[in-house]
């Protein structure tokens, strides 16, 4: 019914050229104030907040790294795994009021995952999986009860790289630009992704077959944009 078209007239190249003009003299990074926390601390904060990044903006209310400084126990796996009160404290801070029946088990089970498989350290996940992006994503998304969808896992791994916490050894090119209201909106408005009828990103933000298809195509078209941008950057580097 939607008759999707991916990059029908070379729009990805046009978008890549715009991105290059904006960022060739600027650093691309996640804009988060980590308050000089250690890499271990940054990882545990982002691990537990990434799980809850579902229909809420975890940075909208306050800086979660600041919350960590005041309430470090909310991010200690051994304490979290058996303590509903600590989970409630973090969820209240994040403003995660909806779907508590899912959010609390995610926290408890993901804490148990860290205790049982990663020596209670989210930071060690990268080391234990030898810096392999695919293996880390597989481990985090192996069971739904951990709370990591594919989207959340890729977002978490991207942030760990951008914040200088983890360095990957294999399959870094497999990291996706994940679908959200921003990437979908830009894809639709620039025409890198086109449909037979006009669509609104907000309309698509529901769990249905059409959304799954658009999500997949959105990731695909942004990967093409990345590839075009990479070619432009390579040419620029060669000229220098």
Question: Where would I find each of the regions flagged by the language model?
Answer:
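HhH-family (HhH-GPD) DNA N-glycosylase catalytic core used in base-excision repair
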Residues: 1-240
């Amino acid at each position: 019914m939607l008759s999707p078209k991916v990059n029908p007239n070379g729009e990805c190249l046009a978008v890549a050229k715009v991105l290059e003009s904006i960022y060739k003299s600027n650093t691309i990074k996640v804009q988060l104030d980590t308050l000089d926390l250690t890499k271990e601390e940054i990882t545990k904060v982002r691990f537990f907040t990434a799980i809850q990044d579902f229909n809420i903006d975890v940075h909208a209310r306050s800086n979660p790294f600041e919350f960590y400084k005041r309430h470090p126990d909310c991010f200690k796996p051994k304490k979290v795994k058996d303590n509903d009160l600590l989970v409630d404290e973090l969820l209240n801070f994040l403003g995660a009021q909806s779907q508590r029946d899912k959010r609390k088990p995610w926290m408890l089970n993901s804490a148990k995952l860290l205790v049982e498989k990663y020596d209670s350290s989210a930071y060690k996940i990268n080391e234990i999986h030898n810096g392999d992006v695919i293996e880390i994503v597989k481990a985090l998304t192996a069971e739904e009860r951990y709370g990591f969808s594919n989207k959340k896992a890729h977002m978490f791994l991207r942030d760990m790289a951008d914040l200088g916490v983890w360095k990957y050894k294999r399959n870094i090119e497999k990291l996706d630009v994940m679908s959200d209201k921003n990437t979908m909106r830009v894809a639709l408005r620039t025409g890198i992704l086109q449909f037979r009828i006009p669509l609104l990103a907000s309309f698509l933000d529901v769990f249905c077959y059409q959304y799954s298809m658009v999500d997949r195509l959105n990731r695909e078209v942004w990967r093409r944009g990345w590839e075009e941008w990479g070619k432009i950057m390579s040419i620029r580097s060669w000229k220098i």
